Amino acid sequence: MPSISTNIILAFITALLGMLIFRSHLMSSLLCLEGMMLSMFILSTLTILNLYFTTSFMMPILLLVFAACEAAVGLALLVTVSNTYGLDYIQNLNLLQC
């Protein structure tokens, strides 16, 4: 496995670990999720270019579209939670909490 792919996989794992460790704030979770999507985009683009998958050239673009939609929904949720509660804790999103 080339060193570029290894570094990108390590970046994905680091973002995943950051998502698991720093899950109390919504902003840090969104940043880690964006890092995961960016590393997935770069890895899929490199894989398609290196293996000459001519039929799969649209996959990285679709991944970017879903990442943009995820970022927009996440930021809208962050603004709503911040305006409602004054904090960006994920525990404020629990609907079962009284």
Swiss-Prot record:
EC category: translocase
Entry GO terms, CC: mitochondrial inner membrane; respiratory chain complex I
Membrane topology according to the record: Multi-pass membrane protein
Spans through the membrane: 2-22, 29-49, 61-81
GO molecular function: NADH dehydrogenase (ubiquinone) activity
GO biological process: ATP synthesis coupled electron transport
Keyword Transport listed: yes
Catalytic activity entry: a ubiquinone + NADH + 5 H(+)(in) = a ubiquinol + NAD(+) + 4 H(+)(out)
Subcellular location: Mitochondrion inner membrane
EC number: 7.1.1.2
Keyword terms: Electron transport, Membrane, Mitochondrion, Mitochondrion inner membrane, NAD, Respiratory chain, Translocase, Transmembrane, Transmembrane helix, Transport, Ubiquinone
Top-level taxonomic group: Eukaryota
Function, in words: Core subunit of the mitochondrial membrane respiratory chain NADH dehydrogenase (Complex I) which catalyzes electron transfer from NADH through the respiratory chain, using ubiquinone as an electron acceptor. Part of the enzyme membrane arm which is embedded in the lipid bilayer and involved in proton translocation.
Subunit: Core subunit of respiratory chain NADH dehydrogenase (Complex I) which is composed of 45 different subunits.
Family: Belongs to the complex I subunit 4L family.
Protein name: NADH-ubiquinone oxidoreductase chain 4L
